UniProtKB/Swiss-Prot annotation:
PANTHER family listed in its UniProt record: AROM/DEHYDROQUINATE SYNTHASE, PENTAFUNCTIONAL AROM POLYPEPTIDE
Enzyme class per UniProt: transferase
UniProt key word Ion transport: no
Organism: Pseudomonas savastanoi pv. phaseolicola (strain 1448A / Race 6) (Pseudomonas syringae pv. phaseolicola (strain 1448A / Race 6))
Protein's name in the database: 3-phosphoshikimate 1-carboxyvinyltransferase
Function statement: Catalyzes the transfer of the enolpyruvyl moiety of phosphoenolpyruvate (PEP) to the 5-hydroxyl of shikimate-3-phosphate (S3P) to produce enolpyruvyl shikimate-3-phosphate and inorganic phosphate.
Record-linked HAMAP family: EPSP_synth
Amino acid sequence: MRPQATLTVLPVERPLVGRVSPPGSKSITNRALLLAGLAKGTSRLTGALKSDDTRVMSEALRLMGVQVDEPDDSTFVVTSSGHWQAPQQALFLGNAGTATRFLTAALANFEGDFVVDGDEYMRKRPIGPLVDALQRMGVEVSAPSGCPPVAIKGKGGLEAGRIEIDGNLSSQYVSALLMAGACGKGPVEVALTGSEIGARGYVDLTLAAMQAFGAEVQAIGETAWKVSATGYRATDFHIEPDASAATYLWAAQALTEGDIDLGVASDAFTQPDALASQIIASFPNMPAVIDGSQMQDAIPTLAVLAAFNRQPVRFVGIANLRVKECDRISALSHGLCAIAPGLAVEEGDDLLVHANPALAGTTVDALIDTHSDHRIAMCFALAGLKIAGIRILDPDCVGKTYPGYWDALASLGVRVQR
């Protein structure tokens, strides 16, 4: 059933000025939670994100016998024996793609029958390529629909060997195999195929986290890695702020000619979405073509910003956005066209945004269907900073990765109506 709650962001009359601390990185937090759960001993994760996605990951670990304590709102203390027990119930992971993909592979290293499941949205998101790769490694795993639920019969460890997976597919599949590989029965080589490597920066995040937890990974050229069966060591690990969350604040600053201090320089991030900061800094002269393949979670932000640019912007390399929390290409196109007919058009898997700076200061009657996708809600709030009458459906879906988003905007002087 379509959620009925709506939120309207009231246009601002002055530049947004202030300091906002973005939450911890979702991508890094869920990697760190998984690795801490696989390690023997106690790990302290600081700067962590507390949100729907990290909650379902931590709850899944608890169900399997891992102790996860939360002494404050940005810390997890994870104590594990390094051995997980199969729970009596399915592991419910909501719509968390990272948790679902990462756990599916990791569970092959333990004894017992496991089921990984999610909500109605997760049950439409593909996991078949990861299941196929695990089957080729000898894992007894199935997902009849090609999407969750996934049934895994663990036999105590991945077999040593080489596994190939298409690099054009989700980087989460690659990361899942790499992280699981360190707990196998012998060395595992993960090799990418395909003409392009999608979202390579997220693979680099995975490798850095693995090495921080004691894994030994050897690069074999640019597209393959050999993971030794060392397991993981408990450690203290600090998580940087979320670059995807930062993009909304960078864009809000650009749109209002403001000055928002995030407490961290844009070039200090290791996450690939931080690349968007350079494009946002070029506003209102964003480039005519933007390749989103290496910063996919930043594309919703950039697409809404492009509506106010001085020239049209074509987004390419974004096909994977169709299988995120929703079909984000379609959601962006429909949302922009709700603001102004013809403002955006889908051309294959490209998104063309017809810039119209004159939209600023106008009033429209636009209901934005977020499809309960946090990034659609957050990016269209940016349009509301300049255009009156934009109503956002299901605004609380931002809790997936940025529960404090509306409060952050309010701290800068943005007013909203519910």
